């Protein structure tokens, strides 16, 4: 009976730790989403947004490593590390995607999509001026196909309602969270050293 209670306490602690770490990571990812959304209006913010996006795995690693070091145990097995990491990404995804949905639904009112379409048109005009220098018809045809595919993709993305964009964010966040959780768990796991 005691063993079951101890296991239950451990599971609750894992969930509590994952929720806490997921909240911190979710706040960081929310800031990344907001800075990325602002890059449509202020292009110079791209210099901040790209390092912030690349910093998501680093922040997740630092959070898990901090928990591992504060745990004060010499043994932090891979399964425990992986469960904490994957649950951290799950809770971070829930928080950040909820905030992204609220932003897109009630604050943005289509400004993000309009900004994307405006940037797409500027890019296409710039590339068309460059394409006039092409002499190879095959290269020109390949360029036209690529531009049309880009236009269709951006138009499709901009036509999504806030719930559709949020579903895309959830899917991509969970996919990348699963991949990153395996890598981070491998790095943060500690084996028991037998002396």
Q: Which sequence ranges carry the predicted segments?
A:
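Transmembrane alpha-helical insertion/packing segments
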Residues: 1-72
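Short helix-terminus and kink motifs of transmembrane alpha helices
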Residues: 61, 65, 101, 105, ...
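Individual transmembrane alpha-helix segments
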Residues: 143-176
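Alpha-helical transmembrane segments with an aromatic anchor "belt"
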Residues: 69-90
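Functional transmembrane-helix hotspots
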Residues: 99-137
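Alpha-helical transmembrane segments of multipass membrane proteins
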Residues: 24-32, 55-56, 92-100, 176, ...
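Juxtamembrane interface at the cytosolic side of transmembrane helices
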Residues: 69, 180-195
């Amino acid at each position: 009976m005691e063993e079951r209670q101890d296991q239950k306490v451990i599971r609750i602690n894992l969930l509590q730790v994952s929720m806490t770490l997921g909240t911190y990571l979710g706040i960081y990812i929310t800031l990344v989403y907001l800075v990325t959304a602002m890059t449509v209006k202020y292009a110079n913010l791209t210099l901040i947004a790209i390092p912030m996006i690349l910093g998501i795995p680093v922040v997740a690693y630092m959070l898990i490593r901090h928990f591992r070091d504060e745990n004060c145990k010499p043994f932090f097995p891979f399964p425990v590390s992986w469960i904490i990491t994957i649950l951290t990404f799950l809770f971070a995804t829930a928080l950040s995607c909820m905030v992204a949905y609220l932003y897109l639904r009630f604050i943005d009112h289509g400004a993000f999509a309009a900004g994307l379409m405006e940037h797409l048109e500027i890019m296409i005009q710039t590339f068309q001026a460059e394409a006039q220098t092409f002499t190879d018809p095959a290269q020109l045809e390949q360029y036209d196909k690529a531009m049309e595919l880009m236009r269709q993709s951006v138009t499709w993305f901009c036509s999504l309602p806030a719930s559709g964009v949020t579903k895309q964010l959830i899917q991509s966040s969970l996919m990348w969270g699963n991949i990153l959780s395996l890598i981070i768990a491998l790095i943060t796991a500690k084996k028991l050293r037998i002396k």
